[in-house]
UniProtKB/Swiss-Prot annotation:
It comes from the Archaea. This is Uncharacterized polyferredoxin-like protein MJ0514.1. [4Fe-4S] cluster binds at residues 39, 42, 45, 49, 70, 73, 76, 80, 116, 119, 122, 126, 145, 148, 151, 155. Coiled coil: none annotated. GO terms for molecular function: 4 iron, 4 sulfur cluster binding; metal ion binding; oxidoreductase activity. It holds the Pfam family Fer4_7. The keyword Metal-binding applies. Transmembrane segments: none annotated. Gene3D superfamilies: 3.30.70.20.
């Protein structure tokens, strides 16, 4: 119903349109670094780390942090007497409003007629009556099809594939 109203008011009646909903994505990234010029290798951070992510470097002069193990709790940063440990938290938020896009439905449906056994189970189960008999095979009416995937789901021979 909404698609029909939009199509009418925006002169899109002859187009296949799809509504993309509003969405929000929040990305969080954390980074932890050791300022080697400030590190005095006191070992306090090694002692307090709850996941043993901090060790001495191979030469023993500085500390290294295994970023795969680190849980970014911040305990090491708090005990560091020289503020050599820096935790960076980056936050990126993407907000997209609802949009209307034109869809070429032929790009999303593959009908492999060689696989089709003409059982018509897809035709009988299509909620939009978008499938019709066509000789000994079927034909999908793109104008009626809503890309719901029911035909793909129910076809026993995988003759209809939605991408």
């Amino acid at each position: 119903m909404i698609k029909e109203i939009i199509a009418k008011h925006f002169n899109l009646a002859d187009k296949n349109i799809q509504l993309l909903p509003k969405f929000n994505i929040i990305l969080n990234k954390r980074e932890i670094i050791v300022k080697e010029d400030k590190c005095i290798s006191c070992g306090k951070c090694i002692e307090i780390c709850p996941v043993n992510a901090i060790t001495y470097s191979s030469d023993g002069l500085y500390i290294t942090i295994n970023k795969e193990k680190c849980v970014f709790c911040g305990k090491c940063k708090k005990v560091c007497p020289t503020n050599a440990i820096v935790i960076i938290r980056l936050r990126c938020e993407i907000n997209e409003d609802a949009r209307i896009i034109e869809v070429d439905k032929y790009e999303f449906i593959d009908y492999i007629s060689e696989r089709c056994a003409s059982c018509l189970v897809c035709l009988r189960n299509c909620p939009f009556n978008a499938i019709e008999e066509y000789g000994s095979k079927i034909r999908i009416d793109i104008n009626k099809c809503e890309l719901c995937g029911k035909c793909e789901e129910i076809c026993p021979l995988n003759a209809i594939i939605l991408r």
